[in-house]
């Protein structure tokens, strides 16, 4: 029979282990994020902190960031993008670490003139270097209703999903000499800003400021992630996303999205890589 002291000791060990590996579930713009720029152009629109808007005019855009940093996690939010003529605007949802050799995982939505589709720009940076761009046109109008955009980031891969459909997988290819973002904690950021010099048709379409202010909406922000605190990450291998891989169905969905809706893939850009595609593309 195990003694009372033995049971207490075992319970204490389990408790300390669980505390070390505690995950965060965030879901309120009031308590989990800070509108860190925009001079009033970013607004939380309800009392519970479920709905937030970002606006852009000729003088400034706006943005918010999470209070906490994370090293691995599943981060998702629902977004409804700027309607009508959104040329020159960029609406974002991304993870990023500080410093000059930062890591970053991007969802960027490049606006367009009325009647033409948004371009979804995805990228992965490691130690300040990106060049991993894949771009898509969406199979729906992202300005009519909210859709769920999600980043799954674990030690082996980054998966981008839309409404639960995986559209891109960036695998850890360190064995091939390809850096992977796994050492630097990142915050969640979102922003609406102007980039008319490149965002729409390479800068050919300029922002029509008579349509300002431009406004995008965010809601149902959720994080299941490993919090970085005091130089350590409370990362648990018990989360399904921590070991998540794409099964046969998931891989087929990625192929479907890329076959039907991808408009740019760095892996097939022979002008940029005349000596052959980067090793992670094989």
Swiss-Prot record:
Molecular function terms, GO-annotated: hydrolase activity, hydrolyzing O-glycosyl compounds; polysaccharide binding; xyloglucan:xyloglucosyl transferase activity
UniProt subcellular location: Secreted, Cell wall; Secreted, Extracellular space, Apoplast
Stored Gene3D superfamilies: 2.60.120.200
GO biological process: cell wall biogenesis; cell wall organization; cellular response to auxin stimulus; xyloglucan metabolic process
Disulfide cross-links: 226-235, 267-281
One CC-aspect GO term: apoplast
Keyword check for Cytoplasm: no
Glycosylated residues, chain numbering: 112, 238
Keyword Cell wall biogenesis/degradation (UniProt): yes
Domain GH16 span(s) in chain numbering: 27-218
Catalytic activity from the UniProt record: breaks a beta-(1->4) bond in the backbone of a xyloglucan and transfers the xyloglucanyl segment on to O-4 of the non-reducing terminal glucose residue of an acceptor, which can be a xyloglucan or an oligosaccharide of xyloglucan
One matching Pfam family: Glyco_hydro_16
Keywords assigned by UniProt, alphabetized: Apoplast, Cell wall, Cell wall biogenesis/degradation, Disulfide bond, Glycoprotein, Glycosidase, Hydrolase, Secreted, Signal, Transferase
Site feature: Important for catalytic activity: 106
Residues of the signal peptide: 1-26
Tissues expressing this chain: Root specific.
Its EC number(s): 2.4.1.207
Enzymatic class: transferase
Purpose of the protein: Catalyzes xyloglucan endohydrolysis (XEH). Cleaves and religates xyloglucan polymers, an essential constituent of the primary cell wall, and thereby participates in cell wall construction of growing tissues. Involved in cell proliferation in the tissue reunion process of wounded inflorescence stems. Maybe a downstream target of NAC071 as a consequence of auxin action in wounded stems.
Family as reported in the entry's similarity comment: Belongs to the glycosyl hydrolase 16 family. XTH group 2 subfamily.
Full protein name: Xyloglucan endotransglucosylase/hydrolase protein 20
């Amino acid at each position: 029979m195990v003694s009372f002291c033995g049971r207490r000791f075992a319970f204490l060990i389990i408790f300390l282990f669980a505390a070390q590996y505690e995950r965060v579930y965030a879901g309120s713009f009031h308590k989990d994020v800070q509108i860190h720029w925009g001079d009033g152009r970013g607004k939380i629109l309800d009392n519970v902190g479920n709905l937030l808007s970002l606006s852009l005019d000729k003088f400034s855009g706006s943005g918010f960031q999470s209070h906490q940093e994370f090293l691995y996690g599943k981060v998702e939010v629902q977004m409804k993008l700027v309607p009508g003529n959104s040329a020159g605007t960029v609406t974002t949802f991304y993870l990023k670490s500080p410093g000059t050799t930062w890591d970053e995982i991007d969802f960027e939505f490049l606006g367009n003139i009325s009647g033409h589709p948004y371009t979804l720009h995805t990228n992965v940076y490691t130690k300040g270097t990106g060049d991993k761009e894949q771009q898509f046109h969406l199979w729906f109008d992202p300005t009519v209703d909210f859709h769920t955009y999600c980043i799954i980031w674990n030690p082996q891969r980054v998966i981008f999903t839309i409404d639960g459909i995986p559209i891109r997988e960036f695998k850890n290819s360190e064995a091939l000499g390809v850096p992977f973002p796994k050492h630097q904690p990142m915050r969640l950021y979102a922003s609406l800003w102007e980039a008319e010099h490149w965002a729409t048709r390479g800068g050919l379409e300029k922002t029509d400021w008579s349509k300002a202010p431009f406004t995008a909406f965010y809601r149902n922000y959720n994080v299941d992630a490993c919090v970085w605190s005091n130089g350590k990450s409370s990362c648990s291998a018990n989360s399904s996303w921590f070991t998540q891989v794409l099964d046969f169905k998931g891989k087929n969905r990625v192929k479907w999205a890329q076959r039907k809706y991808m408009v740019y893939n760095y892996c097939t850009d022979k002008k940029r890589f005349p000596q052959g595609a980067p090793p992670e593309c094989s």
